[in-house]
């Protein structure tokens, strides 16, 4: 007589355990803390705006506004984050924005070169300065913090020397007619306009540049051997070198990428405002580092997230515009910035310790 053996019923808690495991793995991602920060910032300023009787923060135009603000520095934040994951800093990226803008202004307005050529010249010169930064760091072994702190001042001085020797002013206007008729000029000044309740809101090309750079950075970090190299170099340069990773080449390439992103941002700002100013970009280096830290990047290298950095940029954009929409004194922005940075570091450290090994 045949017997039938019943299959053991699945444990009632097994599905729940799998769900918890998935949740833990999601929380173990470097971007988890940044996502929590973004949600928290949005809720806080949504409530403040509501209490102040201004609901603009909750509207689509309001969202376009803070996304545009996030995109501006977000353009340089992704390369800065990758460089930090590799264990290095670039404090010169802010002054590089001003320098590249001045080069564009001088070439286009003073020398009469085509806008597209002026932008390309600025990009090439910026990349050369980035390569010099990287070369000095890898050849001397000096901390990149010190090297780029020095080049920050050198590049800012170069911008001042250029403007004083050519125009005697720190501001150079660029003709809007030439911008609109030039292919690169038209690209960097492009925008999409939307009408909501009779009011026009603009979505500038900077948003698409930011998203494109972030997507490329995320792909490189997560899907290519360069991503493994970047993380390995930041975690242990000696071990990475022993495994055949071209440590010097990786670091120099990242410094060049950071400088290129500064030139891209300078091109956008110069075309948007139809001018160049040596003061433009000042302080952007610290804002970009803040975005990266909020996004989960360790100051010691070897760990971080491009997606988290993008969320960090969004959080700062929300905070900056949320203060405006809530009619709060603008001086509170720096208090909010410091609070977000400290909160993000504490939260990210807790997440790393709590969910270590689950990634």
Language model regions located:
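Cytosolic-side transmembrane-helix boundaries in multi-pass membrane proteins
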Residues: 1-47, 235-238, 242-249, 319, ...
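Loop-to-transmembrane alpha-helix initiation sites
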Residues: 31, 144-145, 171, 202-209, ...
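Hydrophobic core segments of alpha-helical transmembrane domains in multi-pass membrane transport
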Residues: 34-47, 80, 153-160, 207-219, ...
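Single transmembrane alpha-helix segments in multi-pass membrane proteins
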Residues: 41-51, 59-111, 135-142, 290-306, ...
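Alpha-helical transmembrane segments within multi-pass membrane transporters and channels
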Residues: 112-153, 311-316
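Helix-loop-helix "hairpin" substructures at the membrane interface of multi-pass membrane proteins
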Residues: 113-114, 118-122, 128-133, 198-275
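Transmembrane helix-bundle core of multi-pass membrane transporters
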Residues: 145-222, 253, 276-278, 356-359
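Transmembrane alpha-helical segments in multi-pass inner-membrane proteins
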Residues: 255, 262, 266, 272-338
């Amino acid at each position: 007589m045949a017997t039938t053996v019943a299959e053991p019923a699945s444990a009632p808690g097994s599905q729940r355990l799998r769900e918890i495991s998935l949740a833990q793995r999601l929380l173990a991602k470097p971007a988890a803390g940044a996502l929590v920060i973004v949600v928290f910032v949005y809720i806080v300023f949504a409530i403040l705006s509501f209490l102040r009787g201004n609901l603009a923060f909750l509207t689509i135009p309001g969202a376009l506004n803070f996304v545009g603000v996030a995109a501006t520095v977000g353009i340089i934040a992704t390369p800065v984050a990758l460089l930090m994951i590799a264990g290095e800093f670039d404090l010169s990226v802010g002054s590089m924005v001003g320098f590249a803008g001045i080069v564009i202004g001088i070439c286009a307005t003073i020398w009469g070169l085509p806008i597209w050529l002026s932008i390309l010249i600025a990009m090439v010169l910026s990349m050369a300065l980035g390569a010099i930064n990287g070369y000095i760091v890898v050849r001397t072994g000096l901390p990149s913090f010190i090297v780029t702190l020095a080049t920050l001042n050198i590049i800012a001085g170069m911008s001042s020397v250029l403007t004083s020797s050519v125009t005697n002013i720190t501001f150079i206007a660029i003709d809007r007619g030439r911008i609109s008729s030039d292919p690169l000029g038209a690209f960097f000044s492009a925008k999409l306009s939307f009408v909501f309740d009779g009011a026009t809101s603009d979505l500038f090309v900077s948003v698409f540049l930011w998203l494109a750079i972030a997507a490329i950075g995320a792909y490189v970090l997560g899907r290519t051997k360069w991503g493994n190299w970047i993380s390995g170099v930041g975690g242990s340069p000696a071990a990475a070198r022993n495994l055949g990773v071209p440590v010097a080449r990786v670091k120099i390439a990242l410094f060049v990428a950071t400088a290129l992103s500064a030139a891209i941002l300078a091109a956008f700002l110069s075309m948007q405002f139809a001018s160049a100013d040596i003061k433009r970009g000042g302080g952007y280096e610290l804002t970009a580092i803040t975005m990266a830290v909020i996004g989960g990047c360790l100051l010691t290298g070897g760990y971080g997230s491009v997606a988290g950095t993008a969320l960090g940029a969004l959080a700062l954009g929300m905070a900056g515009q949320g203060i405006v929409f809530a009619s709060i004194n603008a001086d509170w922005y720096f208090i909010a910035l410091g609070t977000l940075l400290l909160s993000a570091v504490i939260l990210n450290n807790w997440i790393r310790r709590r969910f270590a090994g689950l990634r």
